[in-house]
Swiss-Prot record:
Transmembrane segments: none annotated. It comes from Tityus obscurus. Disulfide bonds join C31-C81, C35-C57, C43-C62, C47-C64. One of its GO terms (molecular function) is sodium channel inhibitor activity. The lineage of its organism: Eukaryota, Metazoa, Ecdysozoa, Arthropoda, Chelicerata. This is Toxin To15.
Length: 83
C-alpha cells in the first residue's frame, strides 16, 4: 500500500516538474492579458508570443500553459495592475 502511494506521489511530482508554469500572461500594464473580444486562436498566438506553448481564452482573460521558467505571469499576491 505504501508503495502505491509513493508511486502516485512520484507521478504527480513528475507532472508538476515536466508540465511547466501556467497562468495568465501579463499585458504592458501588468494586468492579465484580456480576451474580451478575442478568440481561442488569438489567445494561443498571444501565449506563444509570451513564451508559452499554448493557450486559450478563459473569458475575459487569456490562460497559457507551459511558460518558460523566466516568464512573468499574473499573480494575485503581487498584482500591480494599474498601480
Amino acid at each position: 500500500m505504501k508503495g502505491i502511494i509513493l508511486l502516485i506521489s512520484c507521478l504527480m511530482l513528475i507532472e508538476v516538474v515536466v508540465g511547466g508554469k501556467e497562468g495568465y500572461p501579463l499585458d504592458s500594464s501588468g494586468c492579465k492579458a484580456g480576451c474580451f473580444f478575442g478568440t481561442n486562436s488569438w489567445c494561443n498566438t498571444e501565449c506563444k508570443r509570451k513564451s508559452a506553448a499554448k493557450g486559450y481564452c478563459a473569458w475575459p482573460s487569456c490562460y497559457c500553459y507551459e511558460f518558460t521558467d523566466d516568464s512573468k505571469i499574473w499573480n494575485a499576491k503581487t498584482n500591480k495592475c494599474y498601480k
